[in-house]
Design a protein with these regions (language model features):
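Positively charged, solvent-exposed patches that mediate nucleic-acid binding
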Residues: 1-116
Length: 116
């Protein structure tokens, strides 16, 4: 990911859950909050309730969806993407549409492809 680093610390996830804006749809919940850095940071959460490791890894294709659309998403935000149980039956295109829809509702999508 060219413009993004990852969120790994538990307290960073909790801060986004409590203080960030959120948007939910059938497959995902996306939390976002402006950060002070010029880079975006992203974290992914897939619960054990979703399924065994193979299913959870299949849902983690969200990383690739984000990577492909990274230039369309505004920079300087912390994002957490939480997969819902229904995501295990979704195909790649449904997850992509759900992610982009949530980002659009949060006002994260930009017109150009430079991400500024």
């Amino acid at each position: 990911m060219e413009f993004t680093s990852t969120i790994k610390q538990n307290y960073e996830f909790r801060r986004l859950y409590s203080k960030g804006k959120s948007c939910a749809n059938a497959y995902l919940v996306v939390y976002c909050r402006k950060n002070r850095a010029g880079r975006s940071r992203i974290g992914y959460t897939v619960s054990n309730k979703v399924g065994h490791a193979v299913v959870r890894n299949r849902i983690r294709r969200l990383r690739e969806i984000y990577r492909l659309h990274e230039r369309q998403i505004a920079r300087g935000y912390d994002l957490v993407v939480v997969s819902r149980v229904r995501a295990r039956t979704a195909d790649y295109h449904q997850l992509e549409a759900a992610f982009l829809s949530a980002c659009a509702q949060l006002g994260l999508l930009t017109e150009g492809d430079d991400g500024v």
